[in-house]
Amino acid sequence: VTVYENEGTKVDFDGNLRLLL
């Protein structure tokens, strides 16, 4: 499971793009 974080965004292991609050 890899999580990628960049400039207030986050992509979870399902590939969903989310905003970090």
Curated annotation (Swiss-Prot):
GO BP terms in the entry: monoatomic ion transport
Gene Ontology molecular function, alphabetical: porin activity
GO cellular component: cell outer membrane; pore complex
Membrane topology: Multi-pass membrane protein
Subcellular location: Cell outer membrane
Keywords for this protein: Cell outer membrane, Disulfide bond, Ion transport, Membrane, Porin, Transmembrane, Transmembrane beta strand, Transport
Protein known as: Outer membrane protein P2
Domain of life: Bacteria
Record note on quaternary structure: Disulfide bond interactions within and between MOMP molecules and other components form high molecular-weight oligomers.
Transmembrane segments: none
Main location group: membrane
